[in-house]
Amino acid sequence: MYEERPAGLDGAVVWTLTLTEGATARPVLPDGCMDLIWTPGRLLVAGPDTRSHLPDPIPGTRYAGVRFAPGTAPAVLGVPAHELRDLRVDLDDLWGGSRARGLTGRVDEADDPGAALEAVARAAAARARRPDPLVGDIVRRLAAGEPVAAVAAVAGLGTRHLHRRSREAFGYGPKTLARILRLQRALGLVRLGVSYAAAATRSGCADQAHLAREMRALTGMTLSDYRASAKRETPQPSGSSTTA
């Protein structure tokens, strides 16, 4: 069973998952996000994905996560996003063993691991440097389909400078982020019952064939693969949220 709710951090979500016997995990698709994840005895970080990731959760085991809004996790974790791209890393590799073990034990002992993990994330955010102030505007403009050059101009940056800032915040350049956000926008429409053809044009793709190419390039899946996975019984966290 998968559940999520808004977290007490700007744009973040707290999610919990328990996979039942016989349920099949869905592929996790890129969405520009990063996650702090707990499973009994372990805390790890899921970096920003550029391809789909198939988790291998253990039936009956509880999982909890904080999914950070695009570009906000690096300031909290103290690591540039590009260093974690397409990786799952134990938190003790980033914060040191003693600190990570203490936090893991605190979440292990909590009646509500999701709330305890959220408290860990909020405490880390309170101590962290402020996120890049341009991040939110970059995400909003790219999500709206604005060209990268226009986003750079509004931000007062050259395209190379925007690329560097984007790698640090999101894990990849603005063009890749724009493609990922466009794909997620299209799939969100599909989940609402919109046809692939209509979702493609409404999200900014030229047509359904363009959407299919983007789906294959960014996830390794076909649109038919996605339709089949979406019919599986057990929901999974979107984007970087994963269990392993």
Question: How would you label these PLM feature ranges?
Answer:
Residues 166-172, 214-222:
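A secondary-structure capping/hinge motif
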Residues 167, 186-189:
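Enrichment for repetitive, rod-forming helical segments
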Residues 1-150, 155-159, 172-174, 188-191, ...:
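Alpha-helical bundle regulatory/interaction domains
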